[in-house]
């Protein structure tokens, strides 16, 4: 049953009647929970206290306490959990800690928990959290993110069969199936599908926990149909009447990956532990057609506050109104004001990021170090750039919304929207790179005069009507004009040269004349 309610569409479009699921109408209010010191968290395994302290955690945030009570506490994980909480509120530990605690008593190593995220960077960050707490209770954590070759991943995830080690032994007396080396796997959809399809011994048969992080993005993009595949493979065998996926195509999985019922596996008549799901986002979708893909069981929504969209409580929002042709100069002056503090600068496109980064290179003696962060760069280049930014070797990172999802940078105090975000969800994910884990932070947004009204209206959806106007000294902007004119000419020459090189190499190059017209925006 769904209830139709008059509301705005998910991305801030025109009003329409969008159906809402009944269980979303009465959420548990995360803000009603207080922080809890580590030593006072009920039923916490004592072995986990020291690892948490080494992580610098002295007290748990409300979202972590709420999730704990619904999984380890009275809730006992009887319902699937949906968490809608601002960026930087502590959602990763909110699911990692209960999963580690629940698996701490396992006797036999099997793949029991799967965490799926949209990007490699996010997955590696989540794995770091599990790595910090899981080993102390005897659990092994693996990753399948494409950081290394699939052969290397297989060697880290799967134990070779005894037949391979002792080929002369009679098959009747040895275990033929390769066994997993990990209890918990953090994966990206593409590499997960690779292992499901091709890796012998990779099985979801014993899976007890499935976490879908950044849920709205994971449901919006198909990602090789990973979700229906995982859902089908984790149903018990009496539920699997067909070997066809949603498109009617045959699935290429070994039979051992199908989850057998408890009776089949010798559980003395007891049902197999159900697959518990946790889905999380700072902007969780309310679309029933999307949520139905998850096949949630009696779901419980944990929501931060009454508003659907929330920004961190310690975030200060500012807007800067300027003409398009002065935006690059205004950005430089603002960055000078921030005095070399770490800062993320978001643009509307990869091309815009590249233009802006290239333009800044033609300004000499800037008092800050900057770098471009783009999907067009090699993965190794992006990784080195991000590491340099985290280590303080780079002050300013310029990129697109690829940087806006889940990436955590310690000590990041400032975010700048060089281009106005198109949707409130975009603003939340961008601004949420700062003011994390109870720290303070600031987000500046450059606006043209005609954008101000729409921007103010957008922020109201995020329960944020206090966005101050920030002014820059006009004389500081004017002093940069002579250099700006020279830099623009050099930029045009540089872009023309790049286009020529790409044309000769056969790469598809963006239209050079279009680049010229948009260099100031």
UniProtKB/Swiss-Prot annotation:
Main EC class the enzyme belongs to: hydrolase
Motif (Q motif): 36-65
Residues covered by the Helicase C-terminal domain: 330-480
SUPFAM superfamilies tied to this protein: P-loop containing nucleoside triphosphate hydrolases
Domain Helicase ATP-binding: 72-302
Coiled coil region boundaries: none
UniProt keyword annotation of RNA-binding present: yes
The protein's Enzyme Commission number: 3.6.4.13
InterPro entries attached to this UniProt entry: DEAD/DEAH_box_helicase_dom, Helicase_ATP-bd, Helicase_C-like, P-loop_NTPase
Comment text on domains: The Q motif is unique to and characteristic of the DEAD box family of RNA helicases and controls ATP binding and hydrolysis.
Protein name: DEAD-box ATP-dependent RNA helicase 1
């Amino acid at each position: 049953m769904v209830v139709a309610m008059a509301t705005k569409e998910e991305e801030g479009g025109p009003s329409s009647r969008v159906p809402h699921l009944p269980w979303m109408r009465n959420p548990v209010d995360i803000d009603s929970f207080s922080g809890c010191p580590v030593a006072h968290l009920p039923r916490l395994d004592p072995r986990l206290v020291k690892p948490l302290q080494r992580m610098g955690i002295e007290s748990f945030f409300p979202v972590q306490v709420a999730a704990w009570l619904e999984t380890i506490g009275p809730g006992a994980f009887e319902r699937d959990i949906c968490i809608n909480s601002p960026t930087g509120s502590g959602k990763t530990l909110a699911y990692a800690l209960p999963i580690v605690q629940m698996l701490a008593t396992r006797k036999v190593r099997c793949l029991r928990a799967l965490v799926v995220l949209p990007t490699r960077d996010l997955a590696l960050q989540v794995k770091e959290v599990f790595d910090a707490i899981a080993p102390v209770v005897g659990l092994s954590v693996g990753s399948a993110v494409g950081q290394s070759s699939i052969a290397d991943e297989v060697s880290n995830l799967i134990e070779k069969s005894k037949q391979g080690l002792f080929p002369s032994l009679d098959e009747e007396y040895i275990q033929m199936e390769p066994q997993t080396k990990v209890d918990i796997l953090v994966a990206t959809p593409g590499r997960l599908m690779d292992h499901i399809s091709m890796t012998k011994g990779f099985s979801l048969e014993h899976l007890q926990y499935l976490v879908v992080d950044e849920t709205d993005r994971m449901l919006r993009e198909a990602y090789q149909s990973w979700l229906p595949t995982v859902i089908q493979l984790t149903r018990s065998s009496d539920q699997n009447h067909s070997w066809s996926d949603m498109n009617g195509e045959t699935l290429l999985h070994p039979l051992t990956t199908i989850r057998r019922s408890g009776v089949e596996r010798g559980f003395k008549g007891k049902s197999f532990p159900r697959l518990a799901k946790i889905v999380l986002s700072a902007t969780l979708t309310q679309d029933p057609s999307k949520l139905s893909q998850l096949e949630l069981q009696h779901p419980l929504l944990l929501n931060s506050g009454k508003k659907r969209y929330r920004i961190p409580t310690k975030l200060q929002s500012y807007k800067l109104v300027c003409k398009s042709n002065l935006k690059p100069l205004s950005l430089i002056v603002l960055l000078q004001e921030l005095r070399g503090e770490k800062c993320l600068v978001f643009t509307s496109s990869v091309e815009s990021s590249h233009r802006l980064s290239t333009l800044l290179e033609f300004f000499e003696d800037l008092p800050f170090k900057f770098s471009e962060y783009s999907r067009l760069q090699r993965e190794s280049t992006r990784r080195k750039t991000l590491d340099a930014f985290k280590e303080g070797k780079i002050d300013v990172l310029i990129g697109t919304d690829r940087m806006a999802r889940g990436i955590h940078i310690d000590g990041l105090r400032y975010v700048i929207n060089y281009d106005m975000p198109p949707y409130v969800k975009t603003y939340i994910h961008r601004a949420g790179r700062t003011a994390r884990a109870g720290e303070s932070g600031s987000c500046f947004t450059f606006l043209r005069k005609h954008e101000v009204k729409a921007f103010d209206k957008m922020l109201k959806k995020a329960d944020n009507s206090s966005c101050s106007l920030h002014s820059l000294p006009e004389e500081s902007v004017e002093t940069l004009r002579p250099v700006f004119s020279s830099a623009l000419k050099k930029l045009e020459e540089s872009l023309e040269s790049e286009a020529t090189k790409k044309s000769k190499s056969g790469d598809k190059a963006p239209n050079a004349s279009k680049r010229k017209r948009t260099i100031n925006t």
